[in-house]
C-alpha cells in the first residue's frame, strides 16, 4: 500500500539518516515532497520527478566524506551527467590473448605424418641474460632424486614380493588355464592376480611416500645448515631503493567472502606498506566476482570505509564484474586487460591473505635483482583460527611445512610451484604467455581451468622465465579452514582442478619439471583411491586364503608342491621402513626447532607433546580423507559437478547432524569392514584397526575437533602453539583489531539498505556500472524493473533481479525515490527491521595495535 502524500514523520525519518546538523535538517523539514527535498539537496535540476533521487546522489554521498573525496578527486560525472565515484583508475587496455590448447598428442603426430603443419611452438621471450648455473644444478639434483626414489621403491618392492604367500607365477601355464573349467582357473589364478595388483599399487604408493621423504630430508639439511647459495632471497641486500618505474599492483580477487575479514586484512596490509615509506610504488585492487546482492552492497560500503579510515582514496580500488567469466583466472585476465599495462609487477592475494610491508617491498626488490624471475612465491604461514582442528593444522603447517617448502626449492630451484596467492608476478610475460584458454572438448574435464596456478607457472617457465619459492621470506600469512568438512569441500574443488590440469601433461613446450608438477598434483588425490584399492585387495587376498583351498600343484607332473610362504621378519622390516618414511620428517622438524629454539612453540616438552598429539590426530583422519578423496576422484570421472563456493573462513563448529550426514556412510563402512575381517581371520584385524577404527570414530572426531572452546583451551596450555600466537606480528594484530571493528558495524541486508537508506543508496548509485545513454528499450526495461520491485517487495525479488537493479544507477535511484514518496510499507518495514538488527553495543578493542607482543 502506498501514499502519494508526503508524511512529516517520513521526511523526518529520512533526514535523520543523513549525516547533517540539526540546523540543516530544520531548513529541509519544510519540503512538500521528496522531489523538492532532492532538488534542494542537489541545488540542480533533473529530468523529471522519478529522477529526483539521482540528482542528489553527489550531495548525499559527500555529507560525511566531502573532504576526503574532494582531496582525492574521487567524484566525476558520466556522459549523461550522473554523479559517479572513481573507484577504479582510468582504463588503459592491453591485449590479452590466450593460446588455444592442443592436448591430443595423437592428433599432433598424425598431422606430422600426413605432412600437415602443426602450429608453431610457443616462442620464448628473447632476452639477453647471463648464463644461469642453477638450471644445470637443478637438473642434476632432480636426476639424483629420481634415482633415490626408484632405488628405494625397487628395494621395497622386492621385500614386498618376498612377503607374499604365493611365489609360483612361473608355474602357471596360461595355455592350459584357458582350456580348463572356469572355477578351477579362478582357484589357480586369483591369488596370483591379487598379489600382482597389490604389488603394483604398493610400488606406486611407496614411490609417492619416498618423494615426500627425500623432499623433507633435503629441506631439513637446508634449514639446519642455513647454507643455500641458490636461494632467491639472497639475490637482494634488502635495503635498495625501489625504482619509480617498479610499480606494483596488489590484487585481491574475491567472491562472496566474509566482508569484514577481507577488508580488515586489506587495511592491515595497506597500512603495513605505508609504514615502509614505499606506498607510492603500490596500488591495491579488490576484484569482486560476488553475485550475492547483500554481499555486493556490503563490499561497497567496506571499500568506502577502508579508504576513508586508512586514507586510501586513489590507492585502494574496487571493481565488481557483472560477467563472471572463467572464475578467478578470468578475473585476473580482466584486470590485466584493463590495467595490467600500468604496472611492472602484480602481487596476488587471497581473500584471507595478509602480507607485511617488509615482505612486499622485499619481493619487489628480489624481482628487480633477478631479471629472469617471472614468479616468486612466498611460503604463507597459517594463523588466525581458533578451532581445535584449525590450530592443529596451523601447528602442522608451521612445524613441518618449512621442511617441505625448503626441500621443494632444493630440488626445483627456479622451476618451482606457484600456489595462486601471496606471490609476486612479472606483468609483461604474464600477460603475454599466461592467459588461459578453456580446455577443448566436452565433459567434466573440459571448459574453464579450475586450478589455474600450476598452469600459469608452467606457461611462465615455458616462456623462459623462472618460478621461484622464497621459502625463508617472513611476513606472508593465510588462514586455514576451521573444520574437517570445510577443508574437504575445498579439497573437492582442488581435486577436480588437478585432474583437469593433467590433460596438459603432454602439451607441447612444457618443461619436464612442470609435467612432473601436474603429475604430483594428480597423485595428491589419486593416491587416496590407490590406497583404498590396496586395502580392499589385501582384504580380498585374506578372503581367498581363508575361504579357498590352496592349489599346491599348478602343472602336470609337478614334482614338489608350492607351499604358501610367510615371512613375518620381512613384513615387520618393511612396515618399519614405511613408518620411518612417513614420520621421520615430523621428528626432524622437532629436532630443528629444538636446535633453533622452541620457546615460541611453547618449549621443548610442549612442542614434542603437540607433535605426538598431532601425529595421532593425523592417523585418525587419514582414512577419513582417503574415503572422501576416493569419492571426489570418482565424482570427477563420472562428471558430477563440483560447486565453486567460497570456503568458510570464520571459526565454525560442525553440528552433529551435519557430521552424521557426511560421515555416516564411512562409519557404517568401518563397522562392516571390521566384522568381515573378524569373520575371515580375527588376528588380521590388528593390522586393520588403524583404518576401520578411524572410520568408526569419524563422526565424534569431526565434531569435537571443530570446537572453538577446545582450541582456546589447548592454546592456554601452550599446545599446538605457533610463533604467530606467541608473539603476533603487527600485521596480524591489526587484522584482528579491524575484523573486530568491522563486525561491529557490518552491513546486514545490504540490498534493502541500497534501495531505502539515503546514504547507502547514494553510494550504490555512484558505484553502479551500467551507465547507458538514453534509449527507448532501456528506458522501458528500467520502468518494468522498478514497477516489479515496488509491486512484489524485497522478499520476492530473486538475486538476478536485485543485481540488475544494483547495476543501474537510474533504476536504483527511481526505486529509492518512489519507495519514500509513495510510502511502500514492505520496503520501509524491511529497512527498519534491518536498522534495528544492527549491533549497537560498543565493543572494546581486542588489544592496542601498538602493544608489545605478549607470550600466550
From Swiss-Prot:
The keyword Zinc-finger does not apply. It is a multi-pass membrane protein. It is found in: Cell inner membrane. Keywords: Cell inner membrane, Cell membrane, Glycosyltransferase, Membrane, Transferase, Transmembrane, Transmembrane helix. The chain crosses the membrane at residues 144-164, 198-218, 517-537, 574-594, 608-628, 684-704. Pathway: Glycan metabolism; osmoregulated periplasmic glucan (OPG) biosynthesis. It holds the Pfam family Glycos_transf_2. One of its GO terms (cellular component) is plasma membrane. It is an enzyme of class 2 (transferase). GO terms for biological process: glucan biosynthetic process. Its EC number is 2.4.1.-. GO terms for molecular function: hexosyltransferase activity. Belongs to the glycosyltransferase 2 family. OpgH subfamily. Involved in the biosynthesis of osmoregulated periplasmic glucans (OPGs). NCBIfam families: PRK05454.1-1 (NF003955), PRK05454.2-1 (NF003958), PRK05454.2-5 (NF003962). This is Glucans biosynthesis glucosyltransferase H. It comes from Pseudomonas fluorescens (strain ATCC BAA-477 / NRRL B-23932 / Pf-5).
Amino acid at each position: 500500500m502506498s501514499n502519494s502524500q508526503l508524511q512529516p514523520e517520513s521526511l523526518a525519518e529520512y533526514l535523520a539518516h543523513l549525516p547533517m546538523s540539526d540546523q540543516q535538517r530544520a531548513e529541509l523539514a519544510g519540503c512538500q515532497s521528496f522531489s523538492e527535498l532532492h532538488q534542494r539537496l542537489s541545488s540542480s535540476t533533473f529530468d523529471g520527478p522519478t529522477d529526483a533521487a539521482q540528482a542528489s546522489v553527489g550531495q548525499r554521498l559527500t555529507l560525511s566524506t566531502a573532504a576526503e573525496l574532494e582531496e582525492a578527486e574521487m567524484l566525476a560525472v558520466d556522459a549523461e551527467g550522473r554523479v559517479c565515484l572513481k573507484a577504479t583508475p582510468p582504463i588503459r587496455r592491453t591485449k590479452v590473448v590466450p593460446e588455444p590448447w592442443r592436448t591430443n598428442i595423437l592428433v599432433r603426430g598424425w598431422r606430422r605424418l600426413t605432412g600437415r603443419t602443426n602450429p608453431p611452438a610457443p616462442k620464448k621471450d628473447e632476452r639477453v641474460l647471463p648464463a644461469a648455473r642453477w638450471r644445470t644444478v637443478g637438473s642434476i639434483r632432480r636426476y639424483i632424486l629420481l634415482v633415490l626414489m626408484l632405488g628405494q621403491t625397487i628395494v621395497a618392492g622386492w621385500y614386498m614380493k618376498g612377503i607374499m604367500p604365493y611365489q609360483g607365477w612361473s608355474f602357471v601355464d596360461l595355455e592350459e588355464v584357458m582350456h580348463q573349467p572356469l572355477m578351477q582357473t579362478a582357484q589357480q589364478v586369483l591369488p596370483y592376480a591379487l598379489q600382482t595388483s597389490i604389488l603394483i599399487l604398493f610400488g606406486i604408493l611407496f614411490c609417492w611416500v619416498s618423494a615426500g621423504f627425500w623432499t623433507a630430508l633435503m629441506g631439513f639439511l637446508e634449514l639446519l645448515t642455513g647454507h643455500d647459495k641458490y636461494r632467491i632471497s639472497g639475490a637482494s641486500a634488502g635495503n635498495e631503493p625501489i625504482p619509480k618505474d617498479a610499480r606494483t599492483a596488489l590484487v585481491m580477487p574475491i567472491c562472496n567472502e566474509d566482508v569484514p575479514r577481507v577488508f580488515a586484512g586489506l587495511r592491515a596490509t595497506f597500512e603495513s606498506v605505508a609504514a615502509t615509506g614505499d606506498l607510492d610504488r603500490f596500488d591495491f585492487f579488490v576484484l569482486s566476482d560476488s553475485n550475492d546482492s547483500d554481499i555486493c552492497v556490503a563490499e561497497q560500503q567496506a571499500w568506502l570505509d577502508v579508504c576513508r579510515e586508512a586514507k586510501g582514496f586513489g590507492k585502494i580500488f574496487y571493481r565488481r564484474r557483472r560477467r563472471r567469466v572463467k572464475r578467478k583466472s578470468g578475473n585476473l585476465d580482466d584486470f590485466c586487460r584493463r590495467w595490467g599495462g600500468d604496472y611492472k609487477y602484480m602481487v596476488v592475494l587471497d581473500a584471507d591473505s595478509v602480507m607485511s610491508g617488509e615482505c612486499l617491498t622485499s619481493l619487489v626488490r628480489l624481482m628487480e635483482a633477478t631479471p629472469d624471475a617471472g614468479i616468486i612465491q612466498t611460503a604463507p604461514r597459517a594463523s588466525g583460527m581458533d578451532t581445535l582442528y584449525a590450530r592443529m593444522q596451523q601447528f602442522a603447517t608451521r612445524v613441518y611445512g618449512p621442511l617441505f617448502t625448503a626441500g621443494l626449492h632444493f630440488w626445483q630451484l627456479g622451476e618451482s610451484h606457484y600456489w595462486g596467492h601471496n606471490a609476486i608476478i612479472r606483468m609483461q610475460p604474464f600477460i603475454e604467455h599466461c592467459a588461459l584458454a578453456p580446455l577443448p572438448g566436452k565433459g567434466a574435464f573440459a571448459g574453464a581451468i579450475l586450478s589455474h596456478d600450476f598452469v600459469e607457472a608452467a606457461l611462465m617457465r615455458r616462456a623462459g622465465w623462472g618460478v621461484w619459492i622464497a621459502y625463508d621470506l617472513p611476513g606472508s600469512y593465510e588462514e586455514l579452514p576451521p573444520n574437517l568438512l570445510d577443508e574437504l569441500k575445498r579439497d573437492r574443488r582442488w581435486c577436480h582442478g588437478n585432474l583437469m590440469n593433467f590433460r596438459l601433461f603432454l602439451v607441447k613446450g612444457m618443461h619436464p619439471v612442470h609435467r612432473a608438477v601436474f603429475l604430483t598434483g594428480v597423485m595428491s588425490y589419486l593416491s587416496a583411491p590407490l590406497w583404498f584399492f590396496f586395502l580392499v585387495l589385501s582384504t580380498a587376498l585374506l578372503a581367498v586364503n581363508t575361504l579357498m583351498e590352496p592349489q599346491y600343484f599348478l602343472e602336470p607332473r609337478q614334482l614338489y608342491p608350492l607351499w604358501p610362504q610367510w615371512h613375518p621378519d620381512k613384513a615387520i622390516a618393511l612396515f618399519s621402513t614405511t613408518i620411518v618414511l612417513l614420520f621421520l620428517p615430523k621428528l626432524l622438524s622437532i629436532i630443528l626447532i629444538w636446535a633453533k629454539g622452541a620457546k615460541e612453540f611453547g618449549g621443548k616438552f610442549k612442542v614434542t607433546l603437540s607433535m605426538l598429539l598431532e601425529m595421532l590426530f593425523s592417523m585418525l583422519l587419514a582414512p577419513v580423507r582417503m574415503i572422501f578423496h576416493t569419492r571426489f576422484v570418482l565424482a570427477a570421472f563420472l562428471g558430477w559437478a563440483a560447486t565453486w563456493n567460497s570456503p568458510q573462513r570464520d571459526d565454525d563448529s560442525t553440528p552433529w547432524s551435519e557430521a552424521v550426514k557426511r560421515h555416516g556412510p564411512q562409519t557404517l563402512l568401518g563397522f562392516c569392514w571390521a566384522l568381515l575381517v573378524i569373520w575371515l581371520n580375527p588376528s588380521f584385524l590388528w593390522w586393520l584397526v588403524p583404518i576401520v577404527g578411524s572410520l568408526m570414530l569419524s563422526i565424534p572426531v569431526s565434531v569435537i575437533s571443530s570446537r572453538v572452546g577446545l582450541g582456546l583451551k589447548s592454546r592456554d596450555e601452550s599446545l599446538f602453539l605457533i610463533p604467530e600466537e606467541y608473539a603476533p606480528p603487527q600485521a596480524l594484530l591489526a587484522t584482528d583489531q579491524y575484523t573486530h571493528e568491522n563486525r561491529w558495524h557490518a552491513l546486514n541486508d545490504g540490498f534493502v539498505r541500497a534501495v531505502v537508506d539515503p546514504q547507502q543508496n547514494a553510494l550504490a548509485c555512484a558505484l553502479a556500472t551500467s551507465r547507458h545513454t538514453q534509449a527507448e528499450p532501456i528506458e522501458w526495461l528500467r520502468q518494468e524493473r522498478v514497477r516489479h520491485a515496488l509491486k512484489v517487495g524485497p522478499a520476492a525479488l530473486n538475486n538476478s533481479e536485485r543485481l540488475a537493479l544494483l547495476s543501474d544507477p537510474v533504476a536504483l535511484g527511481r526505486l529509492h525515490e518512489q519507495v519514500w514518496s509513495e510510502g511502500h510499507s514492505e520496503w520501509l518495514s524491511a529497512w527498519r527491521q534491518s536498522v534495528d538488527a544492527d549491533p549497537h553495543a560498543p565493543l572494546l578493542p581486542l588489544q592496542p595495535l601498538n602493544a608489545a607482543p605478549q607470550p600466550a
